[in-house]
Amino acid sequence: MNKLKGLPPIMYLNLDHRTDRKEHIEGQFKKWGITDFTRWSASRFSTKKIDEWGHKLDLMLLAPSDASIVMNEFTMMIEWYESGISENLLIIQDDLCFDLVEYWPFDWETIMKSLPYNWEIVQFYHCH
């Protein structure tokens, strides 16, 4: 059984200098037969460049690292949405590991069928 059948396109965040993490996540994609993925350069809104883009956010509310992730993810979502490439998108970071998929008692299509009819966004994981 291919538990990831029906998986939407994936966009993953990766800093330009973290080629090790790029290799890790693309190795995961290869292992699981995932071919529809796009790398998003998280260096665009890196903390090192916060003086260039930090004025767009209230940095009193966010740590620079969190602000960087927010800006990269929002910009990525906007670009994806405006492209019309697909109805759904899976956004991940480059340190994700799919190893637990083999233990799922369900598959991706079951997840999609189980969502409420009017869902707009689903967060599967949060690391604090």
Residue ranges and their predicted role:
Residues 1-92, 96-128:
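An acidic/histidine-cluster motif and surrounding catalytic segment
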